[in-house]
Amino acid sequence: MIQESVATGRRKQAVSSVRLRSGNGKIDVNGKTLEQYFPLEVQRATILAPLRMLGDVNSFDLIIRVSGGGVQGQVIATRLGLARAVLQEKEDMKQELKAQGFLTRDPRKKERKKYGRKKARKSFQFSKR
């Protein structure tokens, strides 16, 4: 079927590299199983959503390398990478993946801190008198 599809996904500071190849459903995330790295069922369901659209989740092996950011950022970055890898394999899935929002990269980033302020938008306490 396929040799191997490699794709990258990003969200905030999280970067995920996903390798998709035909196999028997083995998923490796930074040397751990998917259940060990992402313990919550909601996170695992979010990540595997693009594969579920293909049909058989157990007919592919995934090797995922993820770094940076928080857990939820890593989940969304991995989902984007997986959707892009699926798209390389089945280009006719583009409309369905796009309709679900799996191919959309969330552009929101942390706003920089400004001088004269405590944080990006929070000011120092103001005393009228």
UniProtKB/Swiss-Prot annotation:
From the UniProt entry, list the residue stretches annotated as the region Disordered. 97-129
**What domain of life does the native source organism fall in?**
Bacteria
Question: Does the record bear Ribosomal protein in its keywords?
Answer: yes
Q: Which Pfam families match?
A: Ribosomal_S9 (PF00380)
The answer on whether this UniProt entry bears the keyword Ribosomal protein reads yes
BP terms from Gene Ontology = translation
**Which UniProt keyword terms apply here?**
Ribonucleoprotein, Ribosomal protein
Q: Which InterPro entries match?
A: Ribosomal_Su5_D2-typ_SF, Ribosomal_uS9, Ribosomal_uS9_bac/plastid, Ribosomal_uS9_CS, Ribsml_uS5_D2-typ_fold_subgr
- Comp. bias intervals (Basic residues): 110-129
Q: Which residues form the signal peptide?
A: none
What GO molecular function annotations does the UniProt record carry, in alphabetical order?
Answer: RNA binding; structural constituent of ribosome
Q: Which SUPFAM superfamilies match?
A: Ribosomal protein S5 domain 2-like
One GO cellular component term of this record is: cytosolic small ribosomal subunit
The record's family statement is:
Belongs to the universal ribosomal protein uS9 family.
The protein's matches in PANTHER family, at most eight in alphabetical order, are given as:
RIBOSOMAL PROTEIN S9, SMALL RIBOSOMAL SUBUNIT PROTEIN US9M
Annotated protein name in UniProt: Small ribosomal subunit protein uS9
Q: State the organism named in the record.
A: Chlamydia trachomatis serovar D (strain ATCC VR-885 / DSM 19411 / UW-3/Cx)
Q: What gene does the UniProt entry assign to this protein?
A: rpsI
